[in-house]
Amino acid sequence: MIPGEYQIQPGDIELNVGRRTITLKVANSGDRPIQVGSHYHFFETNDALTFDRAASRGMRLNIPASTAVRFEPGQSREVELVDYAGHRRVFGFAGRVMGDL
């Protein structure tokens, strides 16, 4: 192996196979853009985002790690969310859960 070299398997890599997903319509009712990262607990996003918040509890965006979705002021779009895996405990973010989901 050469330092810094990547050894990637050929073919496509499927993300979050077998996990529950939902699609929600999300609108930015604020006057500034809002960006949400791939692993941010969607339930705890900025209050200027309007959507079925209760349905998003325990879920994150179903996008590749280290990417994000940006919502411009007045913009509305559908996003796909996926269940958190593992122990399903959430700490930090906006502090709305701080424990088991």
Curated annotation (Swiss-Prot):
Please give the catalytic activity noted in the UniProt record.
urea + 2 H2O + H(+) = hydrogencarbonate + 2 NH4(+)
**Cellular component GO terms, alphabetical:** urease complex
EC number(s) per entry: 3.5.1.5
- In Gene Ontology terms, what is one molecular function of this protein? urease activity
PANTHER family of this UniProt entry? UREASE
InterPro entries, sorted: Urease_beta-like (IPR002019), Urease_betasu_sf (IPR036461), Urease_subunit (IPR050069)
Which keywords accompany this UniProt record? Cytoplasm, Hydrolase
> What gene name is listed for this protein?
ureB
Q: Subunit structure of this entry?
A: Heterotrimer of UreA (gamma), UreB (beta) and UreC (alpha) subunits. Three heterotrimers associate to form the active enzyme.
User: According to the lineage, what is the superkingdom?
Assistant: Bacteria
List the protein's name.
Urease subunit beta
GO BP, one annotated term: urea catabolic process
Protein family according to the UniProt entry: Belongs to the urease beta subunit family.
Task: Identify the pathway.
Answer: Nitrogen metabolism; urea degradation; CO(2) and NH(3) from urea (urease route): step 1/1
User: Where, per UniProt, does this protein localize?
Assistant: Cytoplasm
